[in-house]
Amino acid sequence: MANPELLEEQREETRLIIEELLEDGSDPDALYTIEHHLSADDFETLEKAAVEAFKLGYEVTEPEELEVEEGDTVICCDILSECALNAELIDAQVEQLMNLAEKYDVEYDGWGTYFEDPNGEEGDDDDYVDEDDDGVRH
């Protein structure tokens, strides 16, 4: 099970991200692509976690090498979902993916999304919000 203190930090971060997006004028009713970030020291370790996330219903990006402090390299990927900008839904995904990261000994590096212009194109069928979505992928 994920560390309760780290989960609480993520919950606080989630609310801060949502608050800042809404203060900046992002569309509160849009469907957002949520990018959860995972990293590991080697491809094989990350691949196991990515495959599990895919089986849970998430979309997974191609792994990339990323140079970090002091020239070290990690392998990273994003675990993607689409949902409303709802803290409880995102909290459920964060907890699920933090547990997965712990299981496979990879790092959960938080999540991000993009500003959604409320004056953007209308009529996009992808903006359907599923009222029954509890955030957890099965």
Curated annotation (Swiss-Prot):
GO MF, one term, reads: endoribonuclease inhibitor activity
UniProt lists compositionally biased (Acidic residues) regions at: 118-138
Cellular component, GO annotation: cytoplasm
Name the UniProt key words of this record, in alphabetical order.
Cytoplasm
The ranges of region (Disordered) come to 111-138
Keyword check for Acetylation: no
Which subcellular locations apply to this protein?
Cytoplasm
Protein family according to the UniProt entry:
Belongs to the RraB family.
Assembly state and interactors?
Interacts with the C-terminal region of Rne.
Record function comment: Globally modulates RNA abundance by binding to RNase E (Rne) and regulating its endonucleolytic activity. Can modulate Rne action in a substrate-dependent manner by altering the composition of the degradosome.
Q: What is this protein called?
A: Regulator of ribonuclease activity B
Protein encoded by which gene:
rraB
